[in-house]
Amino acid sequence: SSETAEAAPAPVRIDAARQAQWNAGQIVLPRAGDGHFYADVSVDGVSTQMLVDTGASVIALTADDAANMGYLWDQQDVRAVAHGAGGDVYGVPITLDRVQLGEIEAHGVRAIIVPEGLEISLLGQSFLARVGRVEIDASGMILGS
């Protein structure tokens, strides 16, 4: 076999379920068996697994994840915060102090707590827009420079 020189090494797929590969300043998330991409994200120092959702305008937290992160709310704080495929989405708008995915970190990130109907927290555009590149290719989803 012959090798060709490249400016940067091509990402290599790691087949282990939900195992991310790190390169300098970027992460490659493998496609899970269900076709989606998942990331282990730290919010204010608390790690949780999120579904990467490029169609979500902000991070959406399940009630359990929000509580584990120390975010509390009253039922009276819940209001229509977005419109999804199934109609209005009800939640509580908040700002997350620090969101980190590997070396990629953002502060003051908009989010919503969705008390009902959300099975897994969503990593949306309020974070993804800050990572630089978001691309999907044969190796997986590439986040970062």
Annotate each predicted stretch with a short phrase.
Residues S1-Q49, T54-S145:
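Pepsin/retropepsin-fold aspartyl endopeptidases
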